[in-house]
Amino acid sequence: MPNQRPLYIPFSGPALLETPLLNKGSAFSSEERDSFNLTGLLPHNIETIEEQSLRAYHQLRSFTTDIDKHIYLRNIQDTNETLFHHLIEQHIEEVMPLIYTPTVGQACEKFSQIYRRKRGLFISYPDRHKIDDMLQNATKQKVKVIVVTDGERILGLGDQGIGGMGIPIGKLALYTACGGISPAYCLPILLDVGTNNQQLLDDPMYMGWRNQRISGDEYNEFVDLFIQAVKRRWPEVLLQFEDFAQENATPLLNRYRDQLCCFNDDIQGTAAVSVGTLIAACLNKGQKLSQQKIAFLGAGSAGCGIAEHIIRQMQREGLTEEQARKQVFMVDRYGLLTDSMTELQKFQAPLVQKESAIESWDKSQKLGLAQVVKQAKITVLFGVSGQKGLFTREVIEALCVNTEHPIVLPLSNPTSRVEATPQEVTSWSRGKAIVATGSPFPNTTFEDQSFEISQCNNSYIFPGIGLGVLAAHATGISDNMLMSASQALADISMEYEKAPGAILPPIKFIREISEKIAYAVALQAIEDKLALPVTAENLERRLKANFWLPRYHNYRRTSF
């Protein structure tokens, strides 16, 4: 059934059919076809959205490669946004990997080759004095959520230049599909500051600014011009930083998190979903997170963000900060981070181990991952290195000496960059490891047992955070709000019946999960005085009011 309240539309004829947010295609009624000058522009038969979705699904299944399926889905999105999201709703477990990870990585690499139609805003450095005009040019005027990238660190693929736009487009599709935020309120933005990817610069089809990346003061001043323009245009917007290089990600977040409601999904979203997954995994084996010894392979902004979030959770569970930091070990390509190292990043410094604390260790070999796992008695292993195959049999077998059920989280995206496949971890641990990954993987087997692999993907968290922020009218996102999101995810995970091996609920329940996380986030925003007080009843009403469903409205004709 279409929504009961009609929409009053000033567009008609081909202009209406060319407006993705309003186009209904063959579902326009006879009255609408007459009223909006559509008679003869569409086939005679009037269809329901269910019938349209069935046809679209059959067409989708006719493609043989994931990238072709991605292109097809993006074409639907750019033609009929309601149908696009109805199709996702009906087949979310099958379609999510096609619109986001892992397929979106290929789409970013081939962005200029597969480009079809404009979506979002491309704000280039040469046009930096026109940013206010560009924001006015946006086809969506009531923007509530922006996802912005500069394309420098796309997934594990590095600098993709203008191709990075695939990430904001995909992320915002998930804000709608998982968090119920209307696509009318979502705006993807690409900051085109050049690229250092010579392959792109040499590509005759590359559509971005052909220049080496700007950096330093030039870069910071450009980003500031953008942020100030956004504040003028949409002062209450939620802005998500996405896939910025680690030397820019943390400084930008720290600089602007008190100026507007913003967060960095790579740092904070990844941390929140990782800690929520880890709490749930610990509950699965009857333990607390604070009982674990945790090692990270990869000490970039994402890994360090997760580590700091873990330390805060350990403090919530009763440890002192000093005790918690002694239980977290960061390993990069140079080995274990210690206080004897120089040239550490600012965000890495608080996470080093003191040399005095490890003076009894055997240091005849480099303190790489295997040595750290053995000597620190590690029970939880995170992979955020973006490097394939670094979780070796030796490492996994050493984990199994330390604990009966080690928790192994190879989170690097896309699947081509994962530290170990779930099947490798399951086999090497003889079915004992509890595993979750950043991208989707098939079930694993050991002997006669089958294990489902949960996807520790930010899509479990950021849509709920966004919905909670909008429902509460929050002016910022605090660490406590992120902690509440993590705890809510873990608590929710205990409510659902799960297959053997699974840590998180099936993705088909993602909308229910997002609503519950949104409620927890909104309550915490009120407690942190980042939102005005509201009764529980009114908060639930706001959440329902903000939750958009892909259904057609009846249209009425009006003038501009």
From Swiss-Prot:
Active site: Y100 (proton donor), K171 (proton acceptor)
Family matches, as SMART domains: malic, Malic_M
Catalytic activity entry: (S)-malate + NAD(+) = pyruvate + CO2 + NADH; oxaloacetate + H(+) = pyruvate + CO2
Annotated keywords: Metal-binding, NAD, Oxidoreductase
Enzyme Commission number(s) from the entry: 1.1.1.38
Residues the record lists as binding a divalent metal cation: E242, D243, D266
Cofactor notes: Divalent metal cations. Prefers magnesium or manganese.
CDD domains: NAD_bind_1_malic_enz (cd05312)
Any one cellular-component term (Gene Ontology): cytosol
Biological process terms in GO annotation: malate metabolic process
Pfam families to which the protein is assigned, alphabetical: malic, Malic_M
Keyword Flavoprotein in annotation: no
Residues holding NAD(+): R153, D266, N413
GO molecular function list: malate dehydrogenase (decarboxylating) (NAD+) activity; metal ion binding; NAD binding; oxaloacetate decarboxylase activity
Cofactor annotation: Mg(2+); Mn(2+)
Site, as annotated: Important for activity: D266
Signal peptide: none
Family: Belongs to the malic enzymes family.
Subunit structure and binding partners: Homotetramer.
Protein name: NAD-dependent malic enzyme
Organism of origin: Psychrobacter arcticus (strain DSM 17307 / VKM B-2377 / 273-4)
Gene designation per UniProt: maeA
